[in-house]
């Protein structure tokens, strides 16, 4: 008999000296009439012990702290051996919560347990966005979190409706996912399973063999993220009119059309020599470099005390640097930089194939373009979650919670734990091709380029650039979509900028448009880490390095659970 599944949520107090759950709600996924809303954590945990089901909280890192705190204060201890009256957790070294498994005992060989998962890992969006994007017949409401609610507080009709909506939105969305066969712990795992189902597990294991941990560690040194760069020429200055273009599904488009690695790599010494059987390669290289005049910098060196990890470098400084580079990255670097004192050390070479992901991407692109609401959003999730799964870190050493003397939770690093890599070379080359796509487009617009962010280019002026004029389309895979045209803008650093965007009213909503069609402008604030509350205080006049405001919630572990303390946000 399959286990029941429930969407759950807590509402909690906001005082450091009075941290507790003042309301809970649960609703059965697939049976929305089976729900309850109450005002006692003890009552909820009694139900948890009796129900022995799978529960989903949206942001388990927050709600889970109250559950683990309760377990510790009621005689349960952490254990990964499945003993009675223990609980196990999956919490990453970075503090990401995935699961709490509470064991109450055994009936014969059957484990009596309730497992609690994070729905945010399956649906990585705010509840409000899920309701809107999935076109669900209800919306997330609002309540005042800071209202005094003493122990035993009777839930008001407004609060009741708010909690019910929250748990119902997630229950409906998860039900749709599960009915599509998307039943793994994370969106990435769902996507990888979907790909294996199309390819077959047997073929997957042949095409993407398990590499040893030492080899994976070496190859992983060539793995880098998206290209995010601000042109110094425009830094901290108000700019006039400009345009933004985004690649439609950047990573899936690279997976669809680029040559990508497969099979067991071959190690080579020295400089890679052309090999038609193994045309893709990762080269370990030591060199000094100087940026050529008129070129965008593309070299970024992390975990090195001599360089800022987020800065793209114009030269190598006083010492040669050692990097692991795909042939895609190396060719870009050779075009953009003068290289000196080059030493080719060794590397890995790979067979290549184009179209490994064609059937998978065709399937979900069809759904994305022919469906609306939930199915469309799930298709986008499937398309965008696969590439990163290939480069999952095999070091899964986690954190273990414990109760400190003051009644708050502490976390220690658990025993070292490793899993098999998936196939890191794939993640390495997909991201390399993605950077290549963005950087080559930006370089071709060198006299206009303001900013790049992974899949987008921001340009001065309002003419479509020559390099992309034949591949501009709002939907086609790998084409550039004209995202917006702005009247003025200001960029401070990576992921920190404001724009007045040209818009017109369509069916009561503001839509981006050309300057000729515009009836007004919409003020847009993009700033990593800045809350919507603080964004409302931003203007062109005060948007600068050093801007400071209260309104950033900082989680603090206290006796009973977690309190979000209002703290200062500063643009540095």
Swiss-Prot record:
Binding site for Mg(2+) 2: 246-247, 453, 455
PROSITE patterns: DNA_POLYMERASE_B
Keywords, in A-Z order: DNA replication, DNA-binding, DNA-directed DNA polymerase, Early protein, Exonuclease, Hydrolase, Magnesium, Metal-binding, Nuclease, Nucleotide-binding, Nucleotidyltransferase, Transferase, Viral DNA replication
Site (Essential for 3'-5' exonucleolysis): 9, 11, 62, 119-120
Residues with site note (Probably involved in binding template-primer structures): 249, 384, 388, 431, 435, 495, 497
Site (Stabilizes the primer-terminus at the polymerization active site and contributes to the coordination between the exonuclease and polymerazation activities): 526
Site annotation Involved in binding template-primer structures: residues: 90
Statement: the UniProt record of this protein carries the keyword Acyltransferase: no
Biological function: Polymerase responsible for protein-primed viral DNA replication by strand displacement with high processivity and fidelity.
Domain comment as written in the entry: The N-terminus contains the 3'-5' exonuclease activity and strand displacement ability. The C-terminus contains the protein-primed initiation, DNA polymerization and pyrophosphorolytic activities.
Similarity remark: Belongs to the DNA polymerase type-B family.
Protein name: DNA polymerase
Organism the protein comes from: Bacillus phage Nf
């Amino acid at each position: 008999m399959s286990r029941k599944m429930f969407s759950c949520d807590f509402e909690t107090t906001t005082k450091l000296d009075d941290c507790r759950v003042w309301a809970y709600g649960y609703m059965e996924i697939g049976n929305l009439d089976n729900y309850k809303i109450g005002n006692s954590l003890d009552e909820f945990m009694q139900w948890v012990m009796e129900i022995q089901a799978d529960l989903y909280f949206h942001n388990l890192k927050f709600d889970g702290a109250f559950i683990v705190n309760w377990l510790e204060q009621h005689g349960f201890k952490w254990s990964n051996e499945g003993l009675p009256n223990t609980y196990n957790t999956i919490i990453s070294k970075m503090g990401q919560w995935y699961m709490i498994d509470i064991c109450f005992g055994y009936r014969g060989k059957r484990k009596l347990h309730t497992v609690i998962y994070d729905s945010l890992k399956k649906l990585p969006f705010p509840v409000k966005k899920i309701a809107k994007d999935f076109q669900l017949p209800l919306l997330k409401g609002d309540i005042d979190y800071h209202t005094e609610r003493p122990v035993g507080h009777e839930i008001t009709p407004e609060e009741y409706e708010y909690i019910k909506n929250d748990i119902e939105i997630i229950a409906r969305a998860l039900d749709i996912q599960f009915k599509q066969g998307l039943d793994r712990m994370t969106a990435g795992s769902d996507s990888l399973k979907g790909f294996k189902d199309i390819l077959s597990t047997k073929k997957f294991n042949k095409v993407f063999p398990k590499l040893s941990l030492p080899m994976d560690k070496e190859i992983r040194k060539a793995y880098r993220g998206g290209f995010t760069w601000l042109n110094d020429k425009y830094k901290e200055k108000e700019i006039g009119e400009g345009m933004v273009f985004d690649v439609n599904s950047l990573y899936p488009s690279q997976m669809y059309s680029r040559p990508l690695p497969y099979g067991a790599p071959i190690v080579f010494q020295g400089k890679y020599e052309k090999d038609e059987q193994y045309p893709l390669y990762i080269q370990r290289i030591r060199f000094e470099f100087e940026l050529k005049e008129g070129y965008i910098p593309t070299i970024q060196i992390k975990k090195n005390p001599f360089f800022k990890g987020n800065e793209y470098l114009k030269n190598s400084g006083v010492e040669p640097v050692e990097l692991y580079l795909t042939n895609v990255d190396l060719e870009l670097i050779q075009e953009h930089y003068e290289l000196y004192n080059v030493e080719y050390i060794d590397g890995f070479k790979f067979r290549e194939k184009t179209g490994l992901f064609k059937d998978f991407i065709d399937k979900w692109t069809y759904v994305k373009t022919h469906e609306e609401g939930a199915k469309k959003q799930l298709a986008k999730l499937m398309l965008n979650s696969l590439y990163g799964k290939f480069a999952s870190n095999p070091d899964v050493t986690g954190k273990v919670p414990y109760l400190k003397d003051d009644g708050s939770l502490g976390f220690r690093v658990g025993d070292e734990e490793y899993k098999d890599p998936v196939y890191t070379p794939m993640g390495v080359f997909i991201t390399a091709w993605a950077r290549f796509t963005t950087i080559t487009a930006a370089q071709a617009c060198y006299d206009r380029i303001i900013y790049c962010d992974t899949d987008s280019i921001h340009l001065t002026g309002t003419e479509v650039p020559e390099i992309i004029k034949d591949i501009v389309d709002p939907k086609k895979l790998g084409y550039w979509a004209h995202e917006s045209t702005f009247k003025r803008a200001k960029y401070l650093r990576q992921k920190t900028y404001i724009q007045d965007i040209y818009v017109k009213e369509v069916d009561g909503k503001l839509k981006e448009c050309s300057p000729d069609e515009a009836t007004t402008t919409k003020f847009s604030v993009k700033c990593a880490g800045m809350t919507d509350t603080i964004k409302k205080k931003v203007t062109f006049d005060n948007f600068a390095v050093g801007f400071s405001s209260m309104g950033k919630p900082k989680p603090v572990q206290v006796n009973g659970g977690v309190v979000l303390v209002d703290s200062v946000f500063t643009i540095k």
